[in-house]
């Protein structure tokens, strides 16, 4: 059952790609499609001034984002639960 669902989904994806390729008049279609699929630079978020969960930090400095605190034991930002 799972294999047939996977094959059906793969077939639909293949049909979509072939349909898009036939409508495209560009000769560089395969390269362009692959570059769009694997372009991760577009999804990088803006750099922030504070460090988020799991980022390394120096205890005593206020480097972590709000609601996070630098763990003196592990030296990374974790959720601050208060006292």
Curated annotation (Swiss-Prot):
GO terms for molecular function: ion channel inhibitor activity; sodium channel regulator activity; toxin activity. Residues 1-21 form the signal peptide. Keywords: Amidation, Disulfide bond, Ion channel impairing toxin, Knottin, Neurotoxin, Presynaptic neurotoxin, Secreted, Signal, Toxin, Voltage-gated sodium channel impairing toxin. Disulfide bonds join 50-65, 57-70, 64-77. One of its GO terms (cellular component) is host cell presynaptic membrane. Negative results: has no activity on Nav1.4, Nav1.5, Nav1.8 and Nav1.9 sodium and calcium currents. Selective antagonist of neuronal tetrodotoxin (TTX)-sensitive voltage-gated sodium channels (IC(50)=1270 nM on Nav1.1/SCN1A, 270 nM on Nav1.2/SCN2A, 491 nM on Nav1.3/SCN3A and 232 nM on Nav1.7/SCN9A). This toxin suppress Nav1.7 current amplitude without significantly altering the activation, inactivation, and repriming kinetics. Short extreme depolarizations partially activate the toxin-bound channel, indicating voltage-dependent inhibition of this toxin. This toxin increases the deactivation of the Nav1.7 current after extreme depolarizations. PROSITE patterns: HWTX_1. This is Hainantoxin-III 12. The presence of a 'disulfide through disulfide knot' structurally defines this protein as a knottin. It is found in: Secreted. Monomer. Residues 22-48 form a propeptide. The modification Leucine amide is found at residue 81. It comes from Cyriopagopus hainanus. Expressed by the venom gland. It comes from the Eukaryota. Belongs to the neurotoxin 10 (Hwtx-1) family. 15 (Hntx-3) subfamily.
């Amino acid at each position: 059952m799972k294999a047939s669902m996977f094959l059906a989904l793969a077939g639909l994806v293949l049909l979509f790609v072939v349909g898009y390729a036939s409508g495209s008049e560009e000769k560089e279609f395969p390269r362009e499609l692959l570059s769009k699929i694997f372009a991760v630079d577009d999804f990088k978020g803006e750099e922030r001034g504070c460090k988020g969960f799991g980022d390394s930090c120096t205890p005593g400095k206020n480097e972590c984002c709000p609601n996070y605190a630098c763990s003196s034991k592990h030296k990374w930002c974790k959720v601050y639960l208060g006292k």
